[in-house]
Amino acid sequence: SKKFGAKAKRAVFKPNCRLMFGLKNKNYFSSSMDSSDGLSTTLNEMSSQSKKRFVITRMPSENDVFEFAASNKLNSNDLILNGGEEYEIVATTSKANLPKIKKDAKKHRIKLYEIGYVTKGTGVFYKRKGKLIRMKDKGWQHLQP
């Protein structure tokens, strides 16, 4: 759709940095990174650094992404996970701190996506229909031959 195309271009060419939101909530985050290299890259890096398993139960997206993917014969998960360039904050937090972050996000009209949970183990997995599917790092790779 044209609406999605305009939104996607704006995210790349005029990213909306959520610096103040990140700074205000930094004490509530147990870890955080930006998603500029793609969500799959960010989640795999966070998993590697924390030595924890990340289980994704919900793709962070609006219906327009799915509609765009379907109308252009693209895989919506590839668009969501491997695109990058949007500079959104990806963070982990405790259940106790989540309401505080949600309240601040609502106050500043920032849409939050709860996409999964962190547990013992390693790697990043997408939980679909009860099965865990490993999510590979397919985002932007710097200085690769």
Question: What would you call each of these model-derived segments?
Answer:
Residues 1-145:
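Helix-biased detector of long, well-ordered alpha-helical tracts
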